[in-house]
Amino acid sequence: MSHADMSDSSGFNEAAAAFSWNGPKKAINPYLDPAEVAPFSALSNLITLYAADNEQEQLRREELSEQVWERYFFNESRDPVQREMEQDKLISRAKLAHEQQRFNPDMVILADVSAQPTHISKPLMQRIEYFSSLGRPKAYSRYLRETIKPCLERLDCVRDSQLSASFRFMASHQGLEGLLILPEMSQDQVKRLSTLVAAHMSMCLEAACGDLYATDDVKPEEIRKTWEKVAAETLRLDVIPPAFEKLRRKRNRRKPVPYELIPGSLARMLCADWWYRKLWKMRCEWREEQLRAVCLVSKKASPYVSYEAVTHKREQRRKSLEFFRSHELVNEDGDTLDMEDVVNASSSNPAHRRNEMMACVKGLELIAEMRGDCAVFYTITCPSRFHSTLNNGRPNPTWTNATVRQSSDYLVGMFAAFRKAMQPKPGCAGMACGWLSRTMTVLCTGISCVSCAKKTAAPLLHCCVSLPSVKTVRNWAITRGHALSLSGLRWYGVRVAEPHHDGTVHWHLMCFMRKKDRRAITALLRKFAIREDREELGNNTGPRFKSELINPRKGTPTSYIAKYISKNIDGRGLAGEISKETGKSLRDNAEYVNAWASLHRVQQFRFFGIPGRQAYRELRLLAGQAARQQGDKKASTPILDDPRLDAILAAADAGCFATYIMKQGVLVPRKYHLIRTAYEINEEPTAYGDHGIRIYGIWSPIVQGKICTHAMKWKMVRKAVDVQEAAADQGACAPWTRGNNCPLAENLNQQEKDKSADGDTRTDITRMDDKELHDHLHSMSKKERRELAARLRLVKPIRRKDYKQRITDHQRQQLVYELKSRGFDGSEKEVDLLLRGGSIPSGAGLRIFYRNQRLQEDDKWRNLY
């Protein structure tokens, strides 16, 4: 290129740089340049939407045509070629799986896990996938062989123990096949199954009756034999029939047969609701035991109880709260009480329950201090055959498929045998059969009492020998199996039932006893606690039994047991403490413990050796009623005529459990207590036609008559809905919350009036226009903005007083006339009761109530409550 050409091109570039229209144009290349996008408009958007809809419709039609084609043409029944292809495909898959399992045994375990129900396979597969993601094939294979495979074997054993031979026989009946998969069912499925079981029991009753009721001459024993046949069918389902112990056949019956219990028992066995409760409880327990078998209830998974059971308990608590909030209690006078307030004021409130127990334990401590007794803390654990999972989360090889309920029954039986051994043998007044005495005789075979020897005509050898010490005699009696408490050892205290991390029950006991009897009681209790499977302990009995003498210098017995009471109720004051067994907060564990106790029906707390606490509650209730009736009288005015009974009442009213025990007769058997709980038969029948027993009040053997503490009878009814409020919430702008927070202007105006009356000179923002409000808000400081936000959030709820339906005078006259036509008085009291949401009994178990401006009659309360 010449110098002139270069100068011309430079001039051209300068001109192009000066004027954009004079620059070179870009070459057109459709493969590299993006396509020009049309400008967006309403029409283009509409066209795009139509195109998308057409595309979706085309896809839907193609999918539908494929489904129709596969259903009517390419299926096994219509196309033999397709059937052969499907069979070949299944056979090839089975062969491939067999080859894989032959070369890789872990595939067999995975296939077995996948074949389990969802509540078993899903959590296990999550753990298997976690180990697979670690990238350690040997650890993954070892986990499958050493943990998952034993879990599946234990699961099969648990299922075999749950499905007994009689249970399988009942499942063979038509329609009852669902009994075999009871743990896998939902609530709706269990309800349907319970209806079928109730129908089967009805058919059994009809078959058992036959021509029995064709004549009027039917003997009660024949009716009982009919009941036996229905009860036998119920026992096949591992369900104990109602009143079974009182009605069953006994060889040596001391009391006459209560034939009046047969109708109520039959009504329950023929009721679908009764069967639903039994089957649902059985389903939950079986499902939980299956989860325990596969190690899903442990410190490594979910401590104490499965997460599914905790979730169910939360939902049950939520439904209970909704039920309490939607119902109220109404008495004969028309007075109403909110049911939620009543429940929170009772012992169902965890705080009240904890306070009452702490007061009782404090009373025991004061009694022990006065008597000079010592306090010992015991811990008793079940043998290893009751524990399903080890501390490391692996299956326990010594577990014998024992359930949580069986572990609780083991401890109850052990404790009953121990207490029986502590009772004095009647008729014995000597050394080993009565109170210890240093006056004894010596036999050639050992030591015995004179009275027993005379009764049995045993040869006595009266010798003047040196008598052994009391300690030597105690140790000899224990080793000889005499359970030396034949000497009448006395103790009292409280026991707490707690779960291990795998749900197995263990006990903590706070016991008070005489100092001289501590060693004998401890040795006797250790003997009963370790007598089963003794060989697995060796010389160390600590894993099964522990005892610790409470040192007053370190802490009182009440302070020692307070932790165990709190962490088994609501975890109050234990948020900062961590459980050594689970590694979680004790307050968080309280929810799991409550769900565990509710599911397995384990009694968490039990006092023994002291007067009953129900009479203590009734006395406190009586004292409160008397205080309201006395009014302005002096507080020291006696309530009961007998001074001894009034002293017990005063002690209970003051909340001093120690004084209450002293006034009741100290630590004596219940038959010697001065005040006891009185019961009566309920007047109104239950839904099954029988009459239950309810608490009446108190009674005393030293005076005649009973004192009623439940004179007022309350009925549980559903809260009536205010018609005006319900109509106001039906508009198009009805709020979704309970209180209407819109508009805020009225609320703010009312607040500004209140502030101005108090001398508040803040600016009224409701009278500003948009510009003034904008400037004012941007000029506010952070403190003023926080105050404004708090004022905007402040909405006073509308409090509604006792509800009463509003009707016109004409409607009231119609109501009175209709009441009189039905045989009622039509008085103002009856009208007011109906308008407040109450009801009036109309006979035959029915009740009449007023709703939607008319009288209605049904058995709603009888069926539901």
Curated annotation (Swiss-Prot):
GO BP annotations of the record are: DNA replication
Kindly state which keywords UniProt assigns to this record, in alphabetical order: DNA replication, Endonuclease, Hydrolase, Nuclease, Transposable element
Q: According to the UniProt entry, which residue ranges have a biased composition of type Basic and acidic residues?
A: 751-783
Known EC number(s)? Answer: 3.1.-.-
InterPro entries in alphabetical order? Replication_gene_A-like (IPR008766)
**Disordered: annotated segments:** 749-783
MF term (GO), any: endonuclease activity
Top-rank taxon: Bacteria
Residues annotated as the enzyme's active site: 560, 564
* Function noted in UniProt: Possible endonuclease which induces a single-strand cut and initiates DNA replication.
Recorded family membership: Belongs to the phage GPA family.
The identity of this protein, by name, is: Probable replication endonuclease from retron Ec67
Organism name: Escherichia coli
